[in-house]
């Protein structure tokens, strides 16, 4: 698989000059929550909130005042996957994909926390390859388990490192940025209805209730090989909030209400709890998953 399969790359702002003075420390507080909802009998959503760190533990040394641990934070990783199929296979697909991507990132992302501008394309390429590998793994599993034929999953992944955000995405889960009291959807929905909006076949306001809004056109696994990775990179600022979520949230809770909750709750756990509760209050027709991350500036 190669870069010709790239869905899109969008950038906001510029990467820090590698020779400029380092910025203040980058702190991320985050939380994730998943709920079955009010209708479904099982939860096919999977999520991960994780940190990538580089650590050296010193057990014995004759050097004076040796520290027990030297650790450097390298990045914060967020993943949301929504299994497709409405059966046990959907749960298998989302779980397998998340575990596969965890392993890929652990073995591949060997970047320092002092991100250089020249490294950005490499990070985007790594995230893209993570989706490609997870997609291939699902088809390998189907060969071994024919009863899982057609299983698939959405996948939305974000990596926050050194005041930069990198996003890789396939499907109709979403990544949002809440900044300066504005909620911005960073990812596109890969659905038939969304594609009709992009081609100006239907108006944007008609997408919300269109019968094809749930027809996902780009996922990991499914019936056709070849997931397309939508990629983004942008600057982060102190006070920003990130939201990654499955469509079980956005189908139930309108964006103005999501923005109001994020404005009221900068604490990630409280924000997640309120978002999930609001989706359930409005019917909870699907599994509901939300990850909220609060970007802060540490002491210099």
Predicted stretch roles:
Residues 1-300:
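PP2C/PPM-type serine/threonine phosphatase catalytic domain
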């Amino acid at each position: 698989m190669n870069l010709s399969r790239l869905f899109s790359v969008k950038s906001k702002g510029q990467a820090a000059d590698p020779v400029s003075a380092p910025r203040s420390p980058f702190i991320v507080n985050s939380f994730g929550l998943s709920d079955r909802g009010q209708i479904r009998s099982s939860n096919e959503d999977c999520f991960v909130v994780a940190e990538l760190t580089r650590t050296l533990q010193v057990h014995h040394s004759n050097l004076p005042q040796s520290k027990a641990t030297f650790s450097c934070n390298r990045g914060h990783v967020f993943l949301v996957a929504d299994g497709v199929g409405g059966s046990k296979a959907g749960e298998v697909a989302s779980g397998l994909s998340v575990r596969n991507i965890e392993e890929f990132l652990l073995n591949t992302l060997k970047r320092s926390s002092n991100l250089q501008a020249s490294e950005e394309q490499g990070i985007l390429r790594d995230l893209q390859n993570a989706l490609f590998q997870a997609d291939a793994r699902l088809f390998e599993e189907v060969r071994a388990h024919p009863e899982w034929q057609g299983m698939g999953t959405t996948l939305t992944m974000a990596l926050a490192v050194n005041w930069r955000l990198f996003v890789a995405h396939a499907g109709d889960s979403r990544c949002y940025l809440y900044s300066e009291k504005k909620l911005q959807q960073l990812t596109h929905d890969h659905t038939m209805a969304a594609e009709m909006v992009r081609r100006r076949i239907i108006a944007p306001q008609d997408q919300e209730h269109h019968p094809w809004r749930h027809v996902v056109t780009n996922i990991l696994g499914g019936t056709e090989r070849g997931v397309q990775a939508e990629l983004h990179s942008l600057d982060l600022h102190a006070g920003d909030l990130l939201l990654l979520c499955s469509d079980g949230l956005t189908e139930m809770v309108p964006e103005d209400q999501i923005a109001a909750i994020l404005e009221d709750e900068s604490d990630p756990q409280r924000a997640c709890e309120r978002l999930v509760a609001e989706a359930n209050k409005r019917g909870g027709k699907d599994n509901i998953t939300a990850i909220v991350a609060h970007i802060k500036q540490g002491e210099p």
